[in-house]
Amino acid sequence: QNQGVDIRTAAKVASINLKGSCVAGVTLENGECVTTPLVISNADPVTTFTNLLGLQNMETGMARRVSQIRNNSGTAKIHLALNGLPQFTRLTDEQLGHRLIIAPDMNYIERAFNPIKYQECCSAPVLDISISSVNDPTLTSPGKHVLSALVQYAPYSPIGGWHQHKQAFTDVVIDRISQYAPGLRTQIVASELCTPADLEQNYGMTGGQWHHGELAMDQVLMMRPFPGCSQYASAVDGLYLCGAGAHPGGGVMGLAGSNAAAEVIKRGKKA
């Protein structure tokens, strides 16, 4: 803000506006129009081009490439509010501040993945666990902790719907963690399982794909998100991508955003 930036929250964008083939601004859901010749989107590419820009405003070949982006997700996330620090077997309290992976071997990973091919939930998921309150005590009250885990693999829409499977799958995840942290279940104050469908609904990620596009060989490096849009600038003058759907992808490294900013500066674009 000291640099003249106006930061606005709760200002959801409804559409990207064009003047000819150039960006002219955005329209917010409340009907307000913000005029600008430069839009840098952190939304996933499908949301950006399909929902906000509109495929009808793109060249046919480019629109086809957008429609072919694969956003299938097999990732859920669980959050556990705990009344104490869980005790993982043979791990020190200091080690609990690191990333904990439950994936004993390749066969385990394959067995965890196989059910999703049939829209079923696995019985022994791969888990990527973090207890963020170990490193940041301000997240909770003294003595309390928060455990979060990425859960691989969970179908977007299991047979029968998530309303039939959500609690059972939550129990599967908790039981699996408890095998490594005995007594965990007695420490749980509250739990939340975010399915791929929840991630899509709550965070606007197409398909619940938290990488904004599958990390497959034909969707990474110079192919991300697709040929003709791999250098952050799109075919629409003034529209750029800066999120996980752009090279080199997501995570907490921020490189896609840094690279997009460098590209905007190189092209001499100004809002």
Predicted regions mapped to residue ranges:
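A conserved FAD-binding loop/helix module that cradles the flavin
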Residues: A244-I265
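A glycine-rich dinucleotide-binding beta-alpha-beta segment and adjacent secondary-structure elements
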Residues: A103, C121-S130, G183-H247
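Short glycine/proline-enriched loop/turn "hinge" motifs that connect secondary-structure elements
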Residues: P137-K144, S230-S234
